[in-house]
């Protein structure tokens, strides 16, 4: 059974409301689709200084906009990620909405992006974010779908657990950068697809070379071959 997926490789600016509008507009422009996938931190600059100020509790404005959009379009919507505020903590959270607008799954990024590459990128998510602790899958008419976030995907065991739970498709909102992207983006998505004998989808923000954090782009779909 055919599954039409739109990857929303959108620009992310400092204007939170405009980012939400842009995401919704691009999903509408995708036309006749079954599923849309937004990128990591789709409504927030990828910057530790921004995560808490741009954050919202579950059920906040961005959550409601995505729920309404899924219902309006009658699609499965993997809502990228946004900073979720909960009990004075901040999580990098992906909400998944069913075609009726109901929450189908929620994944908090488990493996925080803490790297310091000599001559390259330094970023420490753990300075502001708290890690999640769950493996996330959800049922669709096309079968089980797994979801994780960016750095999660580097850890083979997490992908294996999703596949063991029945996932034939693993969807990954991600924001690899100009250091990690050229080295590992395509490699990881092809490797996980072959190892797990599943399809993999990686959705990135658009590249903005003027941003403080420059995303690699190159949203990708890989088959098990």
Task: Give the label of every model feature segment.
Residues 1-11:
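Short beta-strand segments enriched in small/hydrophobic residues
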Residues 6, 95-97, 220:
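Conserved hydrophobic/aromatic positions in well-ordered beta-strands
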Residues 9-11, 108, 204:
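Residue-level recognition of beta-strand->loop/alpha-helix junctions
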Residues 85-165, 178-188:
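Active-site catalytic loop in hydrolytic enzyme cores
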